[in-house]
Amino acid sequence: MVAATLLVLGFRSLAFTVYTVEGNCLAPVLQQGDRILVNRWSYGLRTGRPDGLFSYGRVFARRVERGDIVAFDSPVDSLPGVLVCRCRALPGDTVRLGQDLLMIPGRTATCAAEDYYWMESLSPASRVDSRVLGPIAESRIVGRVCCVLY
């Protein structure tokens, strides 16, 4: 029984995690209250933390792809927890701010730093994404949303 419990806890913490969607930033794809399964191995197993005791790294690392729906740790203290957005731009991409997608007309932003991604919600009403938070560091990425459980 103890071995089974340890196996389940290890599987849950290392391979998959279930989150509940709060808000409508990815409507109509994800609705408030949906339970989503996040694959923590999608981009490699995350080890350590940039601000932690052990140095950050990824085992079997893979890059986030444009269009992936990604779960990531919030980069600001005022918004604790895990956020979910779609990856819109990759490291090195220039993002045009204004018109139909982003925030300030006539301005640009660059995900120039290595391992930074531009994340956007699908809902124009939601601003809890890179338009407010800025590019998201790869070290904050938890994993890729692989399915809606219920």
Segments (PLM) and residue ranges:
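Extended hydrophobic leader/signal-anchor segments used for secretion and membrane insertion
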Residues: 1-150
